[in-house]
A protein has these predicted regions:
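Flexible active-site lid/hinge loop adjacent to a nucleotide/diphosphate
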Residues: 2
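C-terminal lobe/tail of nucleotide-utilizing enzymes
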Residues: 6-113
Length: 113
């Protein structure tokens, strides 16, 4: 569970950059309303509860699975490849969050007596 993971990382002083909600929604081929098979907005609620950003909502897309199974990930096929848009949006959000964290973080303190 993501809540337990966030709590564990905080206990050991590892910064949590944010939440990524996998299998967030399904867009049927040919249009039609977006379907939230596992419920809507849980990733956002968790992110808000822990005070971290929601970095992405990854869609359910058969092309993501096919790409992984064949060793040809959709993300490697470019942003406009079927199934890749949500992955690229999430990657941009993670990169921006890493830059923000890098600008505000202090490195570890090592003391030798």
């Amino acid at each position: 569970d993501v809540r337990k993971a966030i709590e564990m990382f905080r206990q050991v002083n590892v910064e949590v950059l944010g939440v990524v909600e996998n299998m967030s929604y399904y867009d049927p081929p040919g249009g039609g309303p977006r379907q939230y098979i596992f419920g809507e907005g849980e990733g956002r609620r968790v992110a808000e509860a822990f005070g971290v950003p929601l970095l992405g909502e990854i869609e359910i897309d058969p092309q993501i699975r096919v790409g992984g199974d064949t060793g040809k990930p959709v993300a490697a096929q470019g942003e406009n490849a079927l199934g890749a848009k949500s992955l690229y949006a999430m990657a941009r959000a993670v990169a921006a969050r890493l830059e923000q964290a890098k600008a505000t973080s202090v490195g570890p303190s090592i003391q030798i007596d």
